[in-house]
Amino acid sequence: MGIFQHIGGPAIVIFIGVMISACGAIWAAWEQSVSESVLRTKSEEIASLNKKIADSIIGGDSFAYITPTFFKDKSSPPYLTLVHQGEHPIYDLSIRVVDLDVFERQVKEGYTIADLHKKENQFNVGNLSTSQASMLGPISIPKNGIRLNIFFSARNGFFSESLRVRKVNDEWKTAIKVENTPTSGEVKLLYEKIDIDFPLNKKGDVEW
């Protein structure tokens, strides 16, 4: 008797055929899985590259804030200093600075909206490189301190800053809070810096 008759004859041939088909199906499935994985990886790489290109053109999540710079020479006025934050340059940056004490006094005195805008300090900065700081100009701070609300407009969107300066033990202390200004969705805190000993209210918070 032949070998196939000893081990089952046609049955073994069928079995071998089934095994070959199964192996072929497994191989095809593996190849498809690998192919899909490669395509998914390539798609993610392309999406990541496109985002990097867009961020480099628009400015990504970069923002800026303003802080007062004080000098050892007391006769020199403090300067408002613009500071860049983020991985990408900021493009087409313009800034509007509102002194809240002046604004509230002018509102009580009946100033018109046009008059109020004339009293605001505005800066057309243009482009701001990464890690760049730029002095915008001197500022006069009253003895009781100053409250500034600062509004930024750039190619990558809008953001705003609350800047508070108070004198403590003959030293100026600063509190800064920067938030995005989305057209929709929730406001997000971008940056916050509060000097040690800055005056706080009874709840332990800054009076923003």
Describe these PLM feature segments.
Residues M1-V13:
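N-terminal positive-inside, membrane-proximal cytosolic segments immediately preceding the first
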Residues F158-W208:
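Acidic, serine/threonine- and proline-rich intrinsically disordered appendage/tail regions
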Residues S33-E36, F103-G157:
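Intrinsically disordered, low-complexity Pro/Gly/Ser/Thr-rich segments with frequent PxxP/GP/PP motifs
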Residues I14-Q85:
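Membrane-proximal alpha-helical anchors
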